[in-house]
UniProtKB/Swiss-Prot annotation:
It is a lipid-anchor; GPI-anchor. Residues 82-101 form a propeptide. A lipid is attached at residue 81 (GPI-anchor amidated serine). Its main location: membrane. It comes from the Eukaryota. This is Long chronological lifespan protein 1. Residues 1-17 form the signal peptide. Deletion leads to fluconazole resistance. It is found in: Cell membrane. Disulfide bonds: none annotated. The gene is LCL1. Keywords: Cell membrane, Glycoprotein, GPI-anchor, Lipoprotein, Membrane, Signal. Disruption phenotype: Leads to long chronological lifespan. It comes from Saccharomyces cerevisiae (strain ATCC 204508 / S288c) (Baker's yeast).
């Protein structure tokens, strides 16, 4: 997604729920990208707003790929400006962007 770079310098709040309402200072990303075609989801996205956190909104049908069942705050690394997501997230992101929907 073209606005994924906004997450690079932000604390990452990963969630396995699509029910967390976005705030005016939240950038939301919906996976898989096919969900972007849903008009009800388009209101959750704003790539031009400066964000204080990054919320990952994941399709509940994909929860079997993740071990979490509720939102979790990833710990900050002292040497990084943001906490790194797990390898499984990067693998999921890569496969989501490369696979046709």
């Amino acid at each position: 997604m073209k606005n994924a770079a906004l997450c690079e310098a932000l604390p990452l709040l990963a969630t396995c729920s699509h029910e967390i309402p976005p705030t005016p200072h939240t950038v939301c990303f919906v996976f898989p990208p096919a969900l972007l075609l849903s008009p009800s989801k388009l209101t959750l996205l704003n790539s031009r707003r400066v964000a204080s956190r990054c919320v990952i909104i994941i399709d509940p049908r994909l929860l079997r790929l993740f071990s979490c069942s509720r939102p979790q705050q990833l710990p900050r690394d002292k040497n990084q400006s943001f906490a790194k997501p797990s390898f499984s997230f990067f693998f999921f992101l890569l496969t989501s962007l490369l696979s046709p929907f």
